[in-house]
Amino acid sequence: MHSSALLCCLVLLTGVRASPGQGTQSENSCTHFPGNLPNMLRDLRDAFSRVKTFFQMKDQLDNLLLKESLLEDFKGYLGCQALSEMIQFYLEEVMPQAENQDPDIKAHVNSLGENLKTLRLRLRRCHRFLPCENKSKAVEQVKNAFNKLQEKGIYKAMSEFDIFINYIEAYMTMKIRN
């Protein structure tokens, strides 16, 4: 009986302590998000560095998939939507194909995808960074070019992932300053 009373007290104290923090946990994570962003981008870059050589060696095309127009969309009024669509594009179209390119890189691509999912989740929790609904023409151009490249598209998209990270950084830096 004594241990169940102790357990009830612990549950009650945990609940009381968690209750005030529940409303502010999201706010706190949003407050600290700008400070955590460099670490999140570093994690993305570190994860990408494990597969970068593999995909860049297989990318035999000279043209860029991620063009300057995409960066301009990231910096413009469509920045939120462009970022959201590009994250979705990489998670749903590029990463699943990239994982199947070689068994030796599958875990590394998976890790890269998990880091990107974590970033997306944090962006969605902090509506100030991802409050959007419009479509980006630049993202549509990226998707069309990717599809036209067929099997070579995966190498192109993955070999340029570092450019995507730089665009994310440019967008987030702009949002943090505003």
Swiss-Prot record:
GO biological process: B cell differentiation; B cell proliferation; branching involved in labyrinthine layer morphogenesis; cellular response to estradiol stimulus; cellular response to hepatocyte growth factor stimulus; cellular response to lipopolysaccharide; chronic inflammatory response to antigenic stimulus; defense response to bacterium
Effect of R42A: About 80% loss of IL10RA binding
Assigned GO CC terms: extracellular region; extracellular space
Cross-referenced SMART domains: IL10
UniProt KW keywords: Cytokine, Disulfide bond, Glycoprotein, Secreted, Signal
Domain of life: Eukaryota
Principal place of residence: secreted
Disulfide bonds: C30-C126, C80-C132
PROSITE patterns with a match to the protein in the record: INTERLEUKIN_10
Known function: Major immune regulatory cytokine that acts on many cells of the immune system where it has profound anti-inflammatory functions, limiting excessive tissue disruption caused by inflammation. Mechanistically, IL10 binds to its heterotetrameric receptor comprising IL10RA and IL10RB leading to JAK1 and STAT2-mediated phosphorylation of STAT3. In turn, STAT3 translocates to the nucleus where it drives expression of anti-inflammatory mediators.
Oligomer and partners: Homodimer. Interacts with IL10RA and IL10RB.
Family classification: Belongs to the IL-10 family.
The protein's name in its UniProt record: Interleukin-10
